[in-house]
Amino acid sequence: MSTPQIDVAYIAKLARIDLTEEETALFSKDLDKVLAYITKLESYDVTGIAPMNHPLPAMDVMREDIPETGFTQEEALSNAPQQSQGQFRTPKVVESA
């Protein structure tokens, strides 16, 4: 499959890339190789093969999510330097307007 040089020149023009004649010829050959590879891939029979995103099977490396009981409110507030109405009390960091 051959790709005319005008295609490479047209693509370069659309991308606003200035190519020399040598670069146009080089990219034309490279494009021919890519299209030949695609043609070769199209010849393979892949019926019955499931599509995949990665060649290795995906596995979950995270632990299973098992609910556990946490601290009670009293336990959480037991080491707080200041508390008020069952909540942590902190110094004021935002001034009123």
UniProtKB/Swiss-Prot annotation:
Keyword Cell membrane included in the entry's annotation: no
SUPFAM superfamilies: Glu-tRNAGln amidotransferase C subunit (SSF141000)
Pfam assignment, any one: GatC
Biased composition (Polar residues): 70-88
One GO-annotated biological process of the protein: regulation of translational fidelity
EC number: 6.3.5.-
Lineage: superkingdom: Bacteria
Gene Ontology molecular function terms on file: asparaginyl-tRNA synthase (glutamine-hydrolyzing) activity; ATP binding; glutaminyl-tRNA synthase (glutamine-hydrolyzing) activity
Region (Disordered): 68-97
Reaction(s) catalysed (UniProt annotation): L-glutamyl-tRNA(Gln) + L-glutamine + ATP + H2O = L-glutaminyl-tRNA(Gln) + L-glutamate + ADP + phosphate + H(+); L-aspartyl-tRNA(Asn) + L-glutamine + ATP + H2O = L-asparaginyl-tRNA(Asn) + L-glutamate + ADP + phosphate + 2 H(+)
Keywords: ATP-binding, Ligase, Nucleotide-binding, Protein biosynthesis
Family: Belongs to the GatC family.
Reported function: Allows the formation of correctly charged Asn-tRNA(Asn) or Gln-tRNA(Gln) through the transamidation of misacylated Asp-tRNA(Asn) or Glu-tRNA(Gln) in organisms which lack either or both of asparaginyl-tRNA or glutaminyl-tRNA synthetases. The reaction takes place in the presence of glutamine and ATP through an activated phospho-Asp-tRNA(Asn) or phospho-Glu-tRNA(Gln).
HAMAP family hit by this protein: GatC
Assembly with partners or alone: Heterotrimer of A, B and C subunits.
Protein name as it appears in the record: Aspartyl/glutamyl-tRNA(Asn/Gln) amidotransferase subunit C
